[in-house]
Regions:
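P-loop NTPase catalytic phosphate-binding loop
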Residues: 6-22, 27-35, 40-44, 51-55, ...
């Protein structure tokens, strides 16, 4: 019996008046599209979602979404035996789209490669708890930066180099403390001002008019929550980190400087309005609650992700696209940088 037949058999056994009209198996996810009979409510599908998942031989909690334009309810389940989606298997340099800072993030749930140009958005926020794939997403952005010859890396690792320590020889600067982060951001603000002066002299308003005029700069900050906590207690420089970050976020894009912030705790105390307003691209891995999901995505849903790199990208060019973050280790990134 095929997947559609198995699903319909399960629905019948549960006395659910719905028909599976489509079933697709992909590398990491399978989904089943149900068309409800008259009188059948979505709530009933949600009530028996666990039993449906078990019936189609999935051990993971399913995710139920309504797709009104198609008149269906979609049940997504994870493939327990799926292979690791390796970045090196996915990345092909000759497939890289034209752009200022194109990044290959992974694969959508329909099997398509997910490319995003970080330069098309002011900046990027990443959130996710332990085991969600947040750190992997950071390493993927670093992997893309390495493969762009004209991208300079500035990394912030408040955990004393635990996350980014292996990049010591390839990054332009790694800050591992609050004080080092403040120094780095001040230097980058000065570089931003210098670039604006050069652009003015050239009669340009943005690096987009000639992407080759400066090397791009990627600022990648892990666990911004730790820095915000320090920032609220430091005297006499209280708030210095936030002020420098907002200054860069508001002005740096036109100068070819792009910021990626990551946090395990996407609370309103960490991602304040002045910060969120300038970080239009959001990558949500699994978070602990619907409240956290609303902070990062302005909607619930990320709390139901499956972990291990199951993520949602929301930006001006990709509206809530679910995808699997590709995997690459820091060691692989370091080997690539030496090639």
């Amino acid at each position: 019996m095929d997947a559609i037949g198995i699903c319909n058999q399960v629905l019948s056994g549960l006395q659910i008046k719905a028909t599976c009209v489509n079933a697709e198996q992909h590398r990491h996810l399978a989904f089943y599209d149900l068309r409800l009979d008259s009188g059948c409510r979505v709530r009933r599908i949600e009530l028996f979602s666990r039993e449906i998942a078990l019936g189609v031989r999935s051990k993971t909690s399913p995710i139920i979404t309504s797709i009104p334009e198609k008149g269906i309810v979609r049940i997504r389940v994870a493939n327990e035996t799926s292979d690791i989606l390796k970045f090196d298997d996915l990345y092909q340099a000759d497939e890289k789209p034209v752009g200022i800072f194109p990044c290959l993030l992974g694969e959508t749930d329909t099997g398509a490669k997910l490319w995003v140009d970080l330069a098309m958005h002011p900046h990027t926020l990443i959130a996710g708890g332990t085991g969600s794939g947040k750190s992997t997403a950071l390493h993927i952005i670093i992997a893309n930066a390495i493969r762009n010859d004209d991208v300079l890396l500035y990394l912030v690792d408040p955990k004393n180099g635990v996350e980014f320590g292996l990049y010591n020889k390839m990054a332009n600067y790694i800050a591992t403390s609050y004080e080092e982060t403040i120094y780095m951001l001040k230097e980058l603000c000065a570089e931003m001002d210098r670039r604006y002066f050069v652009l003015h002299e050239l009669g340009m308003s943005s690096i987009e008019q000639n992407p080759n005029v400066f090397p791009k700069i990627a600022i990648i900050v892990d666990e911004v929550a730790d820095l915000m906590i320090f920032d609220s207690s430091k005297q006499p420089n209280k708030g210095c980190f936030e002020r420098l970050l907002v200054t860069l976020a508001q002005k740096s894009r036109a100068a070819g400087i792009y910021i990626v912030l990551a946090t395990q705790r996407p609370s309103v105390d960490v991602l304040k309005g002045t910060i969120k307003a300038n970080f239009a691209a959001r990558i949500a891995c699994r978070v602990s609650s619907a409240i956290d999901s609303k902070v990062i995505l302005d909607r619930s849903g990320a709390e139901s992700l499956l972990g291990r790199g199951d993520a949602i990208l929301d930006s001006s060019t990709h509206e809530c696209v679910r995808f699997q973050v590709a995997y690459i280790s820091p060691e692989d990134n370091c080997r690539e940088s030496m090639c």
